[in-house]
Design a protein with these regions (language model features):
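Catalytic cores of the polymerase beta-like nucleotidyltransferase superfamily
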Residues: 1-353
Length: 354
C-alpha cells in the first residue's frame, strides 16, 4: 500500500504524472526513486525528483524537449539528464550497474535493463525504493520501507563492499543521522569503522560538501557523534577528537567536546554558524594549562582561529567562508558577539572560558 504522504506529493505536483505518461506512451518504463520517494513517505518537502528508466539519455532528452521542457546534458556521460519545470529539477538516469576500481570512487558504468539491479547499486536501502506512478505501486526489493519505518541505515548489498566501492557513503551515513535522525545498524557501523582508510581516495571537495549537509541537519550533534565514534573524524578532522580533554582533573570531567556538541545544536542551521560553533573551542587542547589545580585555556580563541583556518583550507572552503568562520572563532568570547546573534557560543559550561 502506498503511503498517503507520497500520494500527496503526486497530488501537489501533477506534472510528475504527465512525465510518467509521456514515457509510457513512448514505450518506456519510468520510476520515481531516491530522496523524492524517501522524503515523500516521511512527509518532507522536496523540489528535486529523481527517476530511473530503460530509455537512453538521448531518448530522455528528446522526450522532454518534445513535451516543452528545458533540459541540460550535465551528467549525460553517466546516463543522466536534467529537465526543469518551474522551480523543480528532474533528474532521469538510465538503468545502470556500477563497478569500481580500488583507487577511485568514480564508477565504471554499464547499462542494465533490470530495475532491481539499478536499485541494488544505491547507497542505502532507504534510497533503493522505486515508485511506479501510473501503476501506483512501490517496488522495494531490499526492504527499504521497513528500514525507513524503523529509522535504520543499512545497505542493499554488503556494507563492507558498498563502503569500499564508494567511501563517501560512510560520511553520507553520518549525514542521514543528522538530517533524518536515523541510525546505522551494527553491521553497517562496523563496516564504516573497518573501511575508514578508504575515505582517503575521496576528494576534499566532496568530503566538504557532505560534511556541510551533515552540519546543517536538524540533529547535527548526533551526526557529529557518528562521525567521531566511527573513526571518520580521525581521517578528516582529527583536531575534533582532541576536544575530549579533562577540564576538571579532580572530577575527571571531559566536557569540551560535549559542550561543543551542545553549541552546534543551538546555533542557526547555516554552514558558517555551524562550523564556527564546531570549531570555537578547537584551540583548547593546544592551550591547556593548570595553575593551582585549576585548568585554564588562555588565548584559546586566537589559537583556535589559526587551527580553524588550517582545517578549512584543507577542506577547500572559500576564502569568504574561512574569513567569516575564523572571525567568529577568534571573537566568540567578546561581548559584541551577542549583537551578531552569537550568544550561544557563550554557553556557560563547567569549564573555565579563559
Amino acid at each position: 500500500m502506498v503511503p498517503t504522504t507520497l500520494l500527496k506529493v503526486l497530488k501537489e505536483n501533477t506534472f510528475l504524472d504527465d512525465v510518467a505518461t509521456f514515457y509510457n506512451n513512448a514505450g518506456f518504463q519510468l520510476y520515481l526513486v531516491g530522496g523524492a520517494v524517501r522524503d515523500g513517505i516521511l512527509d518532507i518537502p522536496t523540489k528535486d525528483f529523481d527517476f530511473t528508466t530503460d530509455a537512453t539519455a538521448d531518448e530522455s532528452l528528446m522526450l522532454f524537449k518534445n513535451n516543452g521542457y528545458q533540459t541540460t546534458e550535465i551528467g549525460k556521460a553517466f546516463g543522466t539528464i536534467e529537465a526543469l519545470y518551474e522551480n523543480f529539477s528532474l533528474h532521469v538516469t538510465t538503468f545502470r550497474e556500477d563497478s569500481y576500481k580500488d583507487t577511485s570512487r568514480k564508477p565504471e558504468i554499464s547499462s542494465s535493463n533490470n530495475l532491481e539491479n539499478d536499485l541494488k547499486r544505491r547507497d542505502f536501502t532507504i534510497n533503493a525504493i522505486a515508485y511506479d506512478l501510473l501503476e501506483n505501486k512501490l517496488i522495494d526489493p531490499y526492504s527499504g520501507l521497513k528500514d525507513l519505518s524503523q529509522g535504520v541505515i543499512t545497505t542493499p548489498v554488503s556494507a563492507d563492499i558498498s563502503f569500499s566501492d564508494d567511501p563517501l557513503r560512510m560520511l553520507r551515513a553520518c549525514r542521514f543521522v543528522s538530517s533524518h535522525g536515523f541510525s546505522p545498524d551494527s553491521d553497517t557501523f562496523e563496516a564504516i569503522k573497518k573501511n575508514i582508510d578508504r575515505i582517503e581516495i575521496v576528494s576534499n571537495e566532496r568530503i566538504r560538501d557532505e560534511l556541510n549537509k551533515l552540519l546543517i541537519g536538524d540533529n547535527p550533534s548526533l551526526g557529529i557523534r557518528a562521525f567521531v565514534e566511527s573513526g571518520l573524524s580521525l581521517k578528516i578532522m582529527p583536531e575534533l577528537d582532541k576536544l575530549k580533554i579533562e577540564v576538571d582533573p579532580k572530577h575527571h570531567h571531559k566536557d569540551v567536546y560535549e559542550h561543543t556538541l551542545i553549541v552546534v545544536d543551538r546555533v542557526s542551521p547555516n554552514i558558517v554558524s555551524r562550523l564556527a560553533a564546531l570549531l570555537h573551542d578547537i584551540g583548547k587542547p593546544n592551550t591547556k594549562g593548570i595553575d593551582n589545580g585549576k585548568v585554564h585555556f588562555r588565548h584559546h580563541e586566537v589559537v583556535g582561529a589559526r587551527i580553524s583556518e588550517q582545517i578549512l583550507k584543507r577542506l577547500k572552503y572559500s576564502k569568504k567562508e574561512i574569513q567569516d568562520i575564523c572571525l567568529l572563532v577568534e571573537n566568540h568570547l567578546r561581548p559584541h558577539t551577542f549583537k551578531m546573534g552569537w550568544s550561544c557560543l557563550l554557553y556557560t559550561s563547567p569549564s573555565p572560558r579563559d
